[in-house]
Design a protein with these regions (language model features):
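Short Fe-S-cluster ligation motifs
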Residues: 41, 128, 139, 144, ...
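Local cysteine-cluster metal-coordination motifs and their immediate loop/turn environment
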Residues: 93, 117-142
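Short amphipathic alpha-helical patches
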Residues: 69, 96, 125-126, 150-154
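FNR/FR-type flavoprotein reductase catalytic core
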Residues: 1-120
Length: 154
């Protein structure tokens, strides 16, 4: 369905260009169709810089993997799970199942970061659109460690 690549484009590019700052970088990006793929020039660079898995919901083109991004999380070769961090961005239902897969692999909630920016409207804490429980997504986030952010799912 949707894509969370826009909010993490900068961090992916940064670590792709500074490989000495990470031991290994895995990136899984999902798009609805090949026509919906964003940042094609970046993707060409990222293919050379990291382990990149690109998925689309369905396609006849053999280059693309098909299906949900969560299908490919168990394939990641994470050498030391306790020294690994994950950033999960996208539709809430995808984030829920992606986090579940990461937890099954042995990651701790504190190692997983989620983004809730889809909830924001004014960005100033005035309209209340982004308020979930006592948290204003626009003021307190939008990025949360999963141990804190798990209470912010609908």
């Amino acid at each position: 369905g949707g894509t969370g690549v826009s909010p993490v484009r900068g961090v992916i590019s940064y670590f792709g260009e500074h490989p000495d700052e990470v031991k290994k970088l895995h990136t899984i990006l999902g798009f609805k169709s090949p026509a919906d793929i964003l940042f094609r020039d970046d993707l060409k660079n990222w293919e050379q810089q990291m382990d990149l898995i690109l998925t689309v919901d369905s396609s006849d083109v053999p280059f693309y993997r098909t299906g949900l991004v969560t299908k490919y999380i168990p394939e990641l070769e994470l050498d030391n799970i306790h020294e690994t961090a994950a950033i999960v961005v996208g539709p809430p239902i995808m984030m829920k199942f992606a986090v579940a897969e990461l937890l099954k692999m042995g990651m701790q909630e504190e190692q997983i970061w989620i983004s809730q920016e889809r909830k924001m409207c004014c960005g100033l804490g005035k309209c209340g659109h982004c308020r979930m429980n006592d948290t204003y997504i626009c003021l307190d986030g939008p990025v949360f460690c999963y141990s804190e952010g798990k209470k912010l799912f609908d």
